């Protein structure tokens, strides 16, 4: 039994991987731009603008998109079970990263405290960059989710079920074997107690 999805071909998966790499590189470049932008601020009366996304380095998480995209491209050419499982795990990680990064960006854009007038322009530009990055997160989420769903077309589910059944049988056999050992040990203890009682009675 296999989950087949003929609409997603190897060429389409390669395109998805390339788009992931491009998104990841763009995020890393934007992180470098924001780093230079915020480091160039001047400490005034109202301080500098340092949002939570800058402190957490969420744009730098684009490296995960680059790595996932590279594995996706390679998995499209070499469709081995281990490669597909590894790539699917990375894409699931990217889904989690996009959700967290988008949440932090929304928190940043929903609050804006007063900053020094000298840093207002930099803060405004940084928030615009965050808005652009926020628009790219749904695209990365959709790509990672699409690959995670379509990758089941290359995974033999019957072998996975068989391996799970085999592991379950081994665990149950081990538990039964331990129970038999405990019962045998209990019987031996009872035998020793009865022999001891007989010896004491004869004495």
From Swiss-Prot:
Keywords: Membrane, Receptor, Transmembrane, Transmembrane helix
Lineage per the UniProt record: Eukaryota, Metazoa, Chordata, Craniata, Vertebrata
Protein's name according to its UniProt entry: Membrane-spanning 4-domains subfamily A member 13
Membrane-traversing stretches: 15-35, 56-76, 84-104, 141-161
GO CC terms: membrane
A Pfam match: CD20
Species, as recorded: Mus musculus
Alphabetized InterPro entries for the sequence: CD20-like (IPR007237), MS4A (IPR030417)
Family of this protein: Belongs to the MS4A family.
Disulfide cross-links: none
Locations listed in the record: Membrane
The keyword Cytoplasm belongs to this UniProt entry's keyword annotation: no
Record membrane topology: Multi-pass membrane protein
